[in-house]
């Protein structure tokens, strides 16, 4: 239990998720490195290393999977309402970490393979989005999406790169995020039919997928379209050539893995999954097309539902601002911390 608590705090799982959006002060390349591939993945890496030892226990399954599911839903929902580009990406990271945690919590070898695959895919599309956000901040002077409108006419090439990366984050077909997300959907369907979980897990997974599409659409539409810029500190323009190279490389990986997953990530995924499972690999397929399956239907429903959520976002913003938007986990944490210090001072004075 103590190890699992360490994992949850390190990888920003609910209710310890609130620190991650406030840890964005580093320069853009550092943020991209820390928040897509290294620091926040340390907790789920520990889950992966402990998977062969602990995954058979019922406590692991229920605690890890339910925490991952709560984090997946909360992060996806909250990301839609963040006005700061990095804030949106931070909460989307929380959601994807919840997805990975949920897969490890399910406890089957195939779920672990899907988790490892999504760790790799998330690192590529999220790093490219953080780099794109840094370019936008550098050239426009702000990350506020209420001001960043209509940048397509000023930065069309950057917009195309960001749109591909956001599509991968949303799980659009022929991009890498679609493949690992479909594997995730497939596992939820399997559990609903074979393990007696019934309908609620696939429903929750599809709902999270809808919000992922919605916040990805907001990243694209609010920044590059949606009217004209509003009082930008600088006149935006395309960045210097070498500033775009890291984003280009990562976006090419998103495309290449989405189209040719077995050729590009196949050997690396097999090696990483074998190291995680500490044994033989289960049968799995990295094909782009598996036919008309329930997982594909969930993916298409998530895309359609996400577009619908984004189309009716204004009433949702109003409801959010009057309800859950008022809750601040960081404020609760600081109050608890202050209470601990006051209690320690009282005990010290008595002694």
What label would you give each PLM region?
Residues 126, 210-217, 258, 299-319:
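Hydrophobic alpha-helical membrane-embedded segments
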Residues 172-189, 259-278:
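Membrane-helix interface motif
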